[in-house]
Amino acid sequence: MLSILWNLAAFIIALGVLITVHEFGHFWVARRCGVRVERFSIGFGKALWRRTDRYGTEYVIALIPLGGYVKMLDERAEPVAPELRRHAFNNKTVGQRAAIIAAGPVANFIFAIFAYWLVFIIGVPGVRPVIGEITPNSIAAQAQIAPGTELKAVDGIETPDWDAVRLQLVSKIGDQQTTVSVAPFGSDQRQDKTLDLRHWAFEPDKQDPVSSLGIRPRGPQIEPVLSEVQANSAASKAGLQAGDRIVKVDGQPLTQWMKFVTFVRDNPGKPLALEIERQGSALSLTLTPDTKSVNGKAEGFAGVVPKIIPLPEEYKTIRQYGPFSAILEATDKTWQLMKLTVSMLGKLITGDVKLNNLSGPISIAQGAGMSAEFGVIYYLMFLALISVNLGIINLFPLPVLDGGHLLFLAIEKLKGGPVSERVQDFSYRIGSILLVLLMGLALFNDFSRL
């Protein structure tokens, strides 16, 4: 319950910030163009708070925080007094109206740059993309990429950490192949390797793009050495102690902790013959895992904690810049996200990305809560990502979105007169139906993931 409330709070804050930014873009440019703004509302429905400024603009925070709007004086909506007609939106030039409409998405892009600027000034921790293991017969194995090498670039784009690698790999969905530059860790002697992506079975909502290629990042090492044995557990009853190294299980040599976990999990209530090393001496013990029900299935449980060797400092990175350099980095990062978003939307349309990858408010709320738990840096990066998505989606040429209004203005400019109200009304209805269908699909996908 607490996690749901946390996710909801983080989601509402994120939505409030991004909607305010978007609508403020419309509001600010409208004011600059001499348009009278009658209402600036965050949310829909019953007003929870309102005030009116000296220009006659009413500011509202409403009950349902799923959007917002800026209401401008417009003769098409209601009669306007003669002395105020020059302040009506419909009486402004095509260029001014286009600027007002485009200002919302542009404000979202500027906010993303600002958020990343803060992130890069604070400093972004990361891990150098050094490969720990390669899965046999995987795409990475077929490209002859070796463990211990570092991924320096993907298709010529530098990848200083794993997040950068993931961002570039996601953009390759639907492509036939991609080229990665690798080098031994600590060296810059690069080699180019070609990844064959024709049979890349990657689903963004379920998998990590790196692991789906058969690459396991170098991380903290988990040794088959016990750091803790829980009291009254199966391991304690078997005589295991902290510091014991497990050498063999049922006669099979053990070099990886996960292999021991698999043995225990798959043998509930069954004796396992262990050979261990304790303070230089070899011992033989018998472990009978306790039985626990997990999702209706019996699994073994030993009650031990392994020894974890932290990642060495030379594998860690921090991207931190001065105020001016941070602007350049933030702009570049935002541009990369914009290109990725457009690419992914295009691949949704062409079918290269499945429609079940479309996410709705529930997935966004979960992302908001998770990023907020990790800290302010990750929450800012989440806000930047959603802000870019909001800006791009609003530029789609659907009549109910900013992009649709811009399309009508472009037609008006070309033909020398506005699109007829009949055509506009029909287009709005079609656009509304399409938008509702997309939202319904996104919600269906959200619920199917729960």
Curated annotation (Swiss-Prot):
The domain-related comment in the record is: Deletion of the PDZ domains leads to dis-inhibition of protease activity and almost complete loss of RseA even under non-inducing conditions.
Pfam families assigned: PDZ_6, Peptidase_M50
Q: Which GO terms describe its cellular component?
A: plasma membrane
Q: What is this protein called?
A: Regulator of sigma-E protease RseP
Q: List required co-factors.
A: Zn(2+)
Q: Which InterPro entries match?
A: PDZ, PDZ_6, PDZ_sf, Pept_M50_Zn, Peptidase_M50
Instruction: Give the EC number.
Output: 3.4.24.-
Q: Which residues span the membrane?
A: 1-21, 104-124, 376-396, 430-450
Q: Which GO terms describe its biological process?
A: cellular stress response to acid chemical; proteolysis; response to temperature stimulus
Look up the domain of life of the source.
Answer: Bacteria
Return the broad EC class.
hydrolase
User: Which one of the record's GO molecular function terms can you name?
Assistant: metalloendopeptidase activity
Result of knocking out the encoding gene: Not essential. Normal levels of sigma-E function at pH 7.0, loss of acid stress induction of sigma-E. 100-fold decreased survival in acidified murine macrophages.
Please list the residue ranges that the record places on the Periplasmic side of the membrane: 22-103, 397-429
Query: Membrane topology type, per the record?
Result: Multi-pass membrane protein
Could you tell me which Gene3D superfamilies the record lists for this protein?
Answer: 2.30.42.10
Record's keyword terms, sorted: Cell inner membrane, Cell membrane, Hydrolase, Membrane, Metal-binding, Metalloprotease, Protease, Repeat, Stress response, Transmembrane, Transmembrane helix, Virulence, Zinc
Residues exposed to the Cytoplasmic side: 125-375
Q: What is its main location?
A: membrane
Reported function: A site-2 regulated intramembrane protease that cleaves the peptide bond between 'Ala-108' and 'Cys-109' in the transmembrane region of RseA. Part of a regulated intramembrane proteolysis (RIP) cascade. Acts on DegS-cleaved RseA to release the cytoplasmic domain of RseA. This provides the cell with sigma-E (RpoE) activity through the proteolysis of RseA.
